[in-house]
Amino acid sequence: MYKWLIENDKYYNFCISYKDYETYKRDGANVDKLLVCPNGAQHRDYHFTEKPLKPSWTLYLGRIEPRKRQYLYQDIYGVEFVGKYTDTTSFDRNRDCYLGQWEHEYKLQHVTDYGNMMLLSDGENGTPLVIKEALVAGLGVVVSKYAAHDLDTSLPFVTVIPDDKWEDIEYVQMKLIENRKISVTMRKEIRQYGIDNFSWQKLVKTYVENIEGMK
């Protein structure tokens, strides 16, 4: 399938990240047939509160799997894990910090309860949707570089953990606390950054412009 996408000269390819675009371009795809339309979140669907119910807690939201590395961080106090469980890692689903899998509507209402979100995955296709959901809900983020492709990492509520610090639990915990302390004071600014950059309110316009620009 990938080979067909690269060699295709008839159909347009919509890339959900600039990472995808650069990969296709590098492998020889016709750049005239590549369009970038990033993934995003409908911010109006996400409940937002300026004062979170759990300001001293971090949410780790995502399928429990090796790539997302939740098993490394289960001993950090102040982190709660949500996502579909798979028995592919040593993650212990019987621990109190694992809240199971949320229904979509519940997620829309309760992401905003937390002080911040973390995602230290070892590979992502651009910035994951869950990070954009966190931002429009007012949460700061602590991420790996692989989950930060579309983020402004100079912002005080965006913390990137270097690869060589992934297994330094004390360091990760320190950065989570630092990020939470900053993020709970900037909830409105964080949400506005999420809306300005990752809301479908903006991205639909990009999609329409891409469609109208097709030759």
Please describe what each predicted stretch is:
Residues 1-14, 27:
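Membrane-proximal helix-turn-helix segments that form the acceptor-binding/catalytic region
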Residues 25, 36-56, 91:
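Acidic anion/phosphate-binding donor-loop and adjacent secondary structure
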Residues 50-68, 74-80:
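Conserved donor-binding/catalytic core segment of Leloir-type glycosyltransferases
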Residues 108, 131-136, 150:
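Short alpha-helical segment that forms part of, or immediately flanks, the ligand-binding pocket
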Residues 112-126, 139:
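Acidic donor-binding loop of glycosyltransferase active sites
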Residues 131, 140-144:
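Short hydrophobic beta-strand element within catalytic cores of glycosyltransferases
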Residues 155-167, 176-180:
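Conserved acidic donor-binding segment of nucleotide-sugar-dependent glycosyltransferases
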Residues 164, 180-212:
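A charged, aromatic-enriched C-terminal amphipathic alpha-helix characteristic of glycosyltransferases
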